[in-house]
């Protein structure tokens, strides 16, 4: 059965990009079903207005409770009963790969609420949102792009969505580390060579090299991740070799 994903958005046109690439193929294969609902369709105000000035004053506009609540209620009625409603905002918990794996494993319908303007009426968040997530400590013009990023990351974890079964497993962060470097033909170009070990055909040595590079890249670029990973004695040896090769103390 297809995973049902929904998006509440004032700009459904933005979401069309999700029908291309990996996510688009997953939709075509019937692995995922994606629907959008526009709160303007439930607005009773002139010109389908869905925003109003914030109580207490201040800049910007706030998306009103009534049309947004009606859109959420309608969307949930068309999705599975165990549908989870997610609001994407800078105030949410920053999502990590492990969070995405847990969410994907639940195989639960997900309804994403994409905010705009100064945000949405707080009563929606407190009474009609199950989880609040953020992509990081920065602000976007709306939640549509964040929802698409979230959905793309979820779809990659669905079996059959990628061309190779090992692609998602090898992604950065899947095992707590950054991915190893990748090369393709030609073996030499502009004086730059592919590492010999990748050309030799010794799969055991290739696996060892990739693990060492993964550990090393994590040490160079995201050392904070190493503090959260339990390294084996072999991992520690490989990391020590990498550090020595890159001018660190041997």
From Swiss-Prot:
The organism's place on the tree of life at top rank: Bacteria
The EC designation for this entry is 2.1.1.228
- Identify the residues that bind S-adenosyl-L-methionine: 115, 135-140
Instruction: Name its cellular compartments.
Output: Cytoplasm
Q: Name one GO cellular component term.
A: cytosol
Task: Extract one GO molecular function annotation from the record.
Answer: tRNA (guanine(37)-N1)-methyltransferase activity
Q: Which reaction does it catalyse?
A: guanosine(37) in tRNA + S-adenosyl-L-methionine = N(1)-methylguanosine(37) in tRNA + S-adenosyl-L-homocysteine + H(+)
Concerning its family, UniProt says:
Belongs to the RNA methyltransferase TrmD family.
Query: What quaternary structure, including any partners, is listed in this protein's UniProt entry?
Result: Homodimer.
What does this protein do, in the record's words?
A: Specifically methylates guanosine-37 in various tRNAs.
User: What is the name listed in the Swiss-Prot or TrEMBL entry for this protein?
Assistant: tRNA (guanine-N(1)-)-methyltransferase
Organism for this UniProt entry: Legionella pneumophila (strain Lens)
Q: What is the lineage of its organism?
A: Bacteria, Pseudomonadati, Pseudomonadota, Gammaproteobacteria, Legionellales
């Amino acid at each position: 059965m297809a995973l049902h994903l929904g998006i509440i958005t004032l700009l459904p046109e933005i979401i069309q990009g999700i029908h291309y690439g990996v996510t688009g193929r997953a939709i075509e294969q019937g692995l995922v079903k994606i629907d959008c609902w526009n709160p303007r369709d439930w607005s009773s105000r002139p010109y389908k207005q869905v925003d109003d000035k914030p109580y207490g004053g201040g800049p910007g506009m706030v998306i009103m409770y009534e049309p947004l609540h009606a859109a959420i209620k309608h969307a949930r009625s068309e999705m599975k009963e165990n549908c989870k409603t997610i609001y994407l905002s800078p105030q949410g918990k920053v999502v990590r790969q492990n969070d995405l794996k847990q969410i994907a494993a639940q195989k639960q319908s997900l309804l994403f609420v994409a905010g705009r303007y100064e945000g949405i009426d707080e009563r929606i968040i407190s009474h009609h949102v199950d989880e609040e997530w953020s992509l990081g400590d920065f602000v976007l013009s709306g939640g549509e792009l964040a929802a698409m990023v979230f959905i793309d990351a979820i779809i990659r974890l669905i079996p059959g969505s990628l061309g190779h079964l090992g692609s998602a497993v090898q992604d950065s962060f899947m095992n707590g580390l950054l991915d190893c470097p990748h090369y393709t033909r030609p073996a030499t170009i502009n004086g730059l060579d592919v590492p010999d070990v990748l050309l030799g055909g010794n799969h055991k040595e290739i696996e060892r090299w990739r693990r060492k590079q993964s550990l090393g890249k994590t040490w160079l670029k995201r050392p904070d991740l190493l503090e959260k990973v339990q390294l084996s004695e072999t991992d520690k040896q490989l990391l020590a070799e990498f550090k020595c090769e890159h001018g660190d103390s041997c």
